[in-house]
Amino acid sequence: MIDQFGRLDVLVNNAGLMLLGPIVGADVEEWERMLSINVQGLLYTTNAALPHLLKAAEDDPRQVADIVNISSIAGRVAWANYGVYNLTKFGVNGFTESLRQEVTKRRVRVGVLEPGGVATELGTHNSGAMREHIDAFVESTEILEAQDIADGIAFMVTRPRRASIAELWVMPTDQA
């Protein structure tokens, strides 16, 4: 990407996996998959992008760069049967805040976007009672569309250089 376009101005960490179920008797391989994608993927991608973002923040035309980490309202509120997913999203929020404090004075803005229910494949990775729970929520709620999240990201990264959006909730009106 850098070779093709010459610079990196924005990183959006959006990969995620949500495998729900009770902690007691859980399949720990599912935990490892969620930790690998939701936490380690974000860490490794951020680590690789940071030198390029710091350089872009020093240069014209923007003189600012952005990292937007996609978390979840599950990073703010814990629910039964969401334990490890909650863990990963609370971790994303904590990492985002720490990184924000480290690099914002160097003009790399770091923010977290925490969506509520969105029409994605995220819930389809579940089965049984958890899938029924997710399907019931989707049927009873006018959930967000991907464009709603894209609009939130665009809002965060297009503020003037002097303004940094550290946290943005985007919720379905029915869920708020």
Tell what function each PLM region has.
Residues P22-I23, E30-E32:
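Substrate-binding pocket helix/loop in short-chain dehydrogenase/reductase
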Residues S72:
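Residue(s) in the substrate-gating loop at a strand-loop-helix junction
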Residues P51, Q101-T104:
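Alpha-helical segment proximal to the catalytic Tyr-Lys
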Residues V112-L113, T120, R131-A176:
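C-terminal helical subdomain
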Residues T46, T88:
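Active-site helix of classical SDR
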Residues M1-G6:
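Conserved amphipathic alpha-helix within the SDR
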Residues V24, V77-G83, T141:
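Active-site loop immediately N-terminal to the catalytic Tyr-X3-Lys motif
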